[in-house]
């Protein structure tokens, strides 16, 4: 996966496979991370937001968005870091 795959999805809702039903996560940001030349592709970070009533534990989720996916992504909860909207925030770091 690369940053270029996710930039068009910013602002869209992705579905994370959960029980009893998929959780809706909005992709609010996709940004590059400092490239130290240690990986075959530039590192990047994705930030997702869920509704206040949805709280995911850190782990691996199968995610989809329209024609994109399924892809397996590790998510972990993070601080809101200035986001004003209510809800929980999660990050996926690709390095």
Model-inferred region functions:
Residues 1-95:
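Surface-exposed, beta-sheet-biased, low-hydrophobicity segments with strongly acidic/polar composition
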């Amino acid at each position: 996966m690369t940053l270029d795959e996710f930039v068009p999805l910013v602002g869209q809702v992705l579905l994370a496979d959960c029980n009893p039903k998929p959780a809706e996560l909005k992709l609010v940001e996709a940004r590059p991370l400092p490239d130290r030349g240690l990986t075959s592709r530039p590192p990047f970070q994705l930030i997702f937001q869920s509704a206040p009533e949805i709280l995911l534990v850190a782990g691996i989720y199968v995610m989809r968005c329209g024609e994109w996916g399924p892809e397996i992504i590790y998510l972990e909860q993070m601080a809101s870091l200035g986001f004003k909207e209510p809800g929980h925030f999660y990050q996926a770091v690709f390095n």
